[in-house]
Curated annotation (Swiss-Prot):
<feature type="topological domain" description="Extracellular">
    <location>
        <begin position="338"/>
        <end position="355"/>
    </location>
</feature>
<feature type="topological domain" description="Cytoplasmic">
    <location>
        <begin position="1"/>
        <end position="99"/>
    </location>
</feature>
<comment type="similarity">
    <text>Belongs to the major facilitator superfamily. DHA1 family. Polyamines/proton antiporter (TC 2.A.1.2.16) subfamily.</text>
</comment>
<feature type="topological domain" description="Cytoplasmic">
    <location>
        <begin position="377"/>
        <end position="423"/>
    </location>
</feature>
<feature type="topological domain" description="Extracellular">
    <location>
        <begin position="510"/>
        <end position="518"/>
    </location>
</feature>
<keyword id="KW-0597">Phosphoprotein</keyword>
<feature type="transmembrane region" description="Helical">
    <location>
        <begin position="487"/>
        <end position="509"/>
    </location>
</feature>
<feature type="modified residue" description="Phosphothreonine">
    <location>
        <position position="606"/>
    </location>
</feature>
<feature type="transmembrane region" description="Helical">
    <location>
        <begin position="216"/>
        <end position="236"/>
    </location>
</feature>
<dbReference type="InterPro" id="IPR005829">
    <property type="entry name" value="Sugar_transporter_CS"/>
</dbReference>
<feature type="transmembrane region" description="Helical">
    <location>
        <begin position="457"/>
        <end position="477"/>
    </location>
</feature>
<dbReference type="Pfam" id="PF07690">
    <property type="entry name" value="MFS_1"/>
</dbReference>
<feature type="topological domain" description="Extracellular">
    <location>
        <begin position="121"/>
        <end position="128"/>
    </location>
</feature>
<feature type="compositionally biased region" description="Polar residues">
    <location>
        <begin position="622"/>
        <end position="631"/>
    </location>
</feature>
<feature type="topological domain" description="Cytoplasmic">
    <location>
        <begin position="478"/>
        <end position="486"/>
    </location>
</feature>
<feature type="compositionally biased region" description="Polar residues">
    <location>
        <begin position="28"/>
        <end position="45"/>
    </location>
</feature>
<feature type="topological domain" description="Cytoplasmic">
    <location>
        <begin position="268"/>
        <end position="316"/>
    </location>
</feature>
C-alpha cells in the first residue's frame, strides 16, 4: 500500500520535500484530496512540503514580513510535533478513533432498514417509499466536501462539527411522527454531515504513519465502512423487535455519543494546522488567506470534487470500468439487507432479530480478506528488506525512524525497485473469482431442504472478494494518477458507489420475490462472472491506457511541453530516486520502459523558463538563503540515460523550493 520518494546522493545534496499543487491553484491555497475507503481520501497532500532551514522561524520572530504558512516545516526528522514521531499508543488511538467514527456513520445506513416493516405497517406507507430513507442517507454519504474543508480547518474540527450535526438530524428522525416527508430530508442531511468521517479519515491515517507502515492501519480503517452495514442489522433487528422502530435511530445516536469524547481527546494530525498553531506560539507572523485565494480554493474544490470526477467517469476507461465494478458489488451488499429478509425470514422463518445474524458470514469474509491483503502487501508488493540492508541516512529520513523502507530491491545494488500500478491488481484477481462463487453458493443453497448454515457460509467468499477488489482498485487509482487527480478518481468512485447502492434496495425485494432466490442471486453471480476478466485485461493493456489518459502523468508532461517547453540546459544538478507509491504522492514508474533490470527511473528537476541567477548553486546569496521558489517548475521522471520519459509533476509559484 505505502510508498515514498527517497533520495540519491548527488553533488547538490537535494532534499525530497516537494509539495504538489494544482496548476491553477494560487500559492496561498492549501491542497485538498480524499480516500473513501470505501473509498477514498483524502488526506493531506502537503506531507513533504519544502523543508525550511532550522533557524528560519527564529529569524521571523524578531519582525519582518509575514511568511507564507506553507513555508513552515518541521524542525527536523526528529521533531516531536511531527505525527510520524508520535508514540505507537498515540498513533493507534488516533487510528482506531477514526475507524470507529467511520463504523458509526456507516451503521446509520442499515440500522434504518430494520425499521421499515414497522413503518409500512404502522403508518401505511409503501415498502419502496419506506426504503427511500436508506436511499437518501446513502446519497448524503456520497458527498465529499469534508476533505477540502479539513485542509483549511484541520481534521479534528471537521470531525467535531460534522458528527454532532449529523446526530441532531438522526434524533429528528427518531422523534418524527413517521411522516416520510419529514424522515427523508432528515435522513439525507444526516448522511451529508456524516460523510466527512469517510472522506477525511484516510487523510488522518496517512498523516501519522510512515510510508512503509501505513498498510496495517489503512486496512483496519477501510474495513470500517464495510463492517458498519454488516454489523448494524444484528443490533437493530433485536432492538426494533423488542422496543420499536425508533430504536434503529437511538442506537446510532448512542454510538455517536460514545465516540464523541474520544474525538475530542484526539490530537490534530494535519501538518499545516499543527505548524500554524506552533507558529502562533512562537510569535511568527503569517500571511492571511486572501479573498482571491479563497475564490481560487473554492474553484479548485468544485473542480476536484464535482466537475472533474464526472468528466473522468466519461473519458477515463480506468476510472469508469473499476468504478462501475466496485459500485456494483457494493450495491449487492446493500441489496442483501432486503434479500436476507426474504431468505431467512421467508424461507427459514427466523425472527426479526435472528434474521440479522447471517450477516456474520459476510463479516468473517471481510476480516479474512483484509488479513489476506496484508499478507500480499508484506510478502509480494513490499517485502521486508534483506539482511544487511543499510539503514536510512539522516537526509533520507522524514521521521525519527532509521530502519530501511520495505519493498523489492535490485539484487546487485540493493536499491528499491519501482512497482508497476498493474501489480496491485493481484488481489483483485483473487476477489473477482471469490465473489461469484459466494453468490452461486447462496443462490443454490438458500432453500428449505438445505440447512440455513449453507447460505450463511456463502457470505464468507462474498465478503472476502468484496474487500480485496476494493483494496486493489484503491491502490490502482492511487498509482495511475497524480495526487489531486487521485482525489477526483476516488470522488468519482465514491459518488457512483453510493448512488448505485442507494438504488438497489428499492427493487431487491421485488426481484427476489418474482425471480425467486435461486435466479435472483444467480443473475448477480453471472454479472460478476462477466467482470472476472477485468483485472487480467487491465494487467495486459493498462499501461497503454495510462499513457493515453487525459489526466495521467503523460498528459501532464505533454501539457508542460506545449505551454513552456522543456529545456534540458536548465536542469538542476541532482536526482531523486523514485521507489514507492502512496495514495497521495506518486509517480508512475513502469519497469517495462527500462532496458535492463538494474536501470532506475529518477526524478529530475527541469524548468519551463530560464533559471534566475539566484538559483545558481555557486551563488553566495543562494547559499545563505536556500528557500528561493522555483518559478513555474516542472518535475519530470526520466530515465537515467535521458532516452525517453516516465511522467511529470506540476507545481506553481512558491509550491516547490530549492533546499
Amino acid at each position: 500500500m505505502p510508498s515514498s520518494l527517497t533520495k540519491t546522493e548527488s553533488n547538490s545534496d537535494p532534499r525530497t520535500n516537494i509539495q504538489q499543487v494544482p496548476k491553477a491553484l494560487d500559492k496561498n491555497v492549501t491542497n485538498s484530496g480524499n480516500l473513501d475507503s470505501t473509498s477514498s481520501s483524502t488526506g493531506s497532500i502537503t506531507e513533504d512540503e519544502k523543508r525550511s532551514e532550522p533557524n528560519a522561524d527564529s529569524n521571523n520572530m524578531t519582525g519582518g514580513e509575514p511568511i507564507d504558512p506553507r513555508d513552515l516545516d518541521w524542525d527536523g526528522p526528529d521533531d516531536p510535533d511531527n505525527p510520524h514521531n508520535w508514540s505507537s499508543l498515540k498513533k493507534w488511538y488516533t487510528t482506531m478513533t477514526s475507524a470507529f467514527l467511520c463504523l458509526v456513520v456507516t451503521m446509520g445506513s442499515s440500522l434504518y432498514v430494520s425499521s421499515v416493516p414497522e413503518l409500512v405497517e404502522r403508518y401505511h406507507v409503501s415498502q419502496t417509499l419506506a426504503l427511500a430513507g436508506l436511499t437518501f442517507y446513502l446519497l448524503g454519504l456520497s458527498t465529499v466536501i469534508g476533505a477540502p474543508l479539513s485542509e483549511v480547518f484541520g481534521r479534528k474540527p471537521v470531525y467535531l462539527f460534522s458528527l454532532p450535526v449529523s446526530m441532531l438530524f438522526t434524533m429528528g428522525v427518531g422523534l418524527s411522527n413517521g411522516h416520510m416527508r419529514i424522515i427523508l430530508p432528515l435522513r439525507f442531511l444526516s448522511g451529508v454531515f456524516a460523510s466527512p468521517a469517510l472522506s477525511v479519515g484516510s487523510g488522518t491515517i496517512l498523516d501519522i504513519f510512515d510510508v512503509d507502515q501505513v498498510s496495517v492501519a489503512m486496512t483496519y480503517f477501510v474495513l470500517s465502512p464495510f463492517l458498519g452495514p454488516v454489523l448494524s442489522p444484528i443490533m437493530a433487528g433485536f432492538a426494533t423487535e423488542a422496543k420499536g422502530w425508533r430504536w434503529s435511530e437511538w442506537i446510532q445516536l448512542i454510538a455517536g455519543g460514545l465516540i464523541l469524547p474520544f474525538i475530542a481527546l484526539m490530537p490534530e494530525t494535519h501538518k499545516g494546522i499543527i505548524l500554524r498553531k506552533r507558529a502562533k506560539k512562537r510569535n511568527i507572523a503569517l500571511k492571511k488567506f486572501s479573498r482571491e485565494a479563497q475564490k481560487e480554493f473554492l474553484k479548485t474544490t468544485v473542480t476536484i470534487t464535482i466537475l472533474r470526477p464526472l468528466k473522468m467517469l466519461v473519458v477515463e476507461p480506468i476510472v469508469f470500468v473499476f468504478s462501475v465494478y466496485v459500485a456494483f458489488i457494493f450495491a449487492i451488499l446493500f441489496g442483501f439487507f432486503e434479500a436476507y429478509a426474504v431468505i431467512y425470514r421467508g424461507v427459514y422463518h427466523m425472527s426479526m432479530g435472528i434474521s440479522g445474524l447471517p450477516f456474520i458470514g459476510i463479516g468473517v469474509g471481510l476480516w479474512i480478506g483484509a488479513f489476506f491483503y496484508l499478507y500480499i502487501d508484506r510478502k509480494y508488493l513490499f517485502p521486508k528488506p534483506p539482511a544487511g540492508t543499510q539503514p536510512l541516512t539522516e537526509k533520507e529520513r522524514t521521521s525519527k525512524r532509521t530502519t530501511p523502507y520495505r519493498g523489492a530491491r535490485d539484487a546487485e545494488t540493493g536499491e528499491l525497485l519501482p512497482v508497476v500500478p498493474e501489480k496491485f491488481l493481484i488481489a483483485c484477481k483473487f476477489g473477482s473469482v471469490a465473489l461469484p462463487i459466494g453468490l452461486f453458493w447462496q443462490a443454490w443453497t438458500a432453500r428449505s431442504d438445505v440447512h440455513w448454515m449453507a447460505p450463511v457460509a456463502a457470505g464468507v467468499p462474498f465478503g472476502f472478494g468484496l474487500i480485496l477488489i476494493f483494496f486493489s482498485v484503491l491502490m490502482y487509482f492511487s498509482t495511475c494518477y497524480p495526487p489531486l487527480t487521485v482525489a477526483s478518481c476516488l470522488a468519482a468512485n465514491n459518488l457512483l458507489r453510493y448512488v448505485m447502492s442507494s438504488v438497489f434496495p428499492l427493487f431487491t425485494i421485488q426481484m427476489y420475490t418474482k425471480m425467486k432466490i435461486k435466479w435472483a442471486s444467480t443473475l448477480f453471480a453471472l454479472v460478476c462472472v462477466v467482470m472476472i476478466p477485468i483485472p487480467w485485461v487491465f494487467e495486459k493493456w493498462g499501461s497503454k491506457l495510462r499513457h493515453k489518459s487525459q489526466f495521467g502523468y503523460a498528459a501532464m508532461e505533454k501539457e508542460a511541453e506545449t505551454e513552456g517547453g522543456i529545456d534540458d540546459v536548465n536542469a538542476v544538478d541532482g536526482e531523486l530516486n523514485l521507489t514507492r507509491m502512496t495514495t497521495l504522492r506518486t509517480m508512475e514508474t513502469d519497469p517495462s520502459t527500462r532496458e535492463k533490470p538494474g536501470e532506475r527511473l529518477s526524478l529530475r528537476r527541469t524548468h519551463t523558463q530560464p533559471v534566475p541567477a539566484s538559483f545558481d548553486r555557486e551563488d553566495g546569496q543562494h547559499a545563505q538563503n536556500r528557500n528561493e521558489p522555483i518559478s513555474n517548475s516542472l518535475y519530470s521522471a526520466i530515465k537515467d540515460n535521458e532516452d525517453g520519459y516516465s511522467y511529470t509533476e506540476m507545481a506553481t509559484d512558491a509550491s516547490a523550493r530549492m533546499v
